[in-house]
């Protein structure tokens, strides 16, 4: 399953908001430096979907706020 994520980094409160079936807003405390925010988003998504971090992969948007992830939950 592919999902679109709008990343909000440097937030005081971390969390995930589901806007539609495959569109999410993910807030993380980490800043977008050295991939820390991407790693935090992957961790948040894996916790949300209750799957291993290795099943969440960033397809596009490595340096963008708009990201495309693939979730392998099979």
Locate each region found by the language model.
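C-terminal structural segments of small proteins and small subunits
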Residues: 42-74
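Compact, glycine-rich, soluble single-domain proteins
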Residues: 4, 25-49
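Arg/Lys-rich, often Gly-containing low-complexity segments of ribosomal proteins
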Residues: 10-11, 30-38, 60-64
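Solvent-exposed residues in well-ordered beta-strands and their adjoining turns
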Residues: 8, 29, 72-74
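N-terminal first-folded block
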Residues: 1-27
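Detector for Asparagine
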Residues: 22, 38, 72-73
């Amino acid at each position: 399953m592919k999902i679109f994520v709008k990343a909000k980094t440097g937030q005081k409160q971390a969390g995930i908001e589901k806007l539609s079936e495959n569109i999410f807003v993910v807030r993380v405390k980490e800043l977008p430096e050295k991939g820390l925010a991407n790693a935090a988003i992957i961790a948040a998504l894996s916790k949300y979907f209750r799957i291993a971090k290795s099943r969440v992969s960033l397809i596009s948007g490595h340096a963008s706020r708009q990201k495309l992830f693939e979730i392998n939950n099979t």
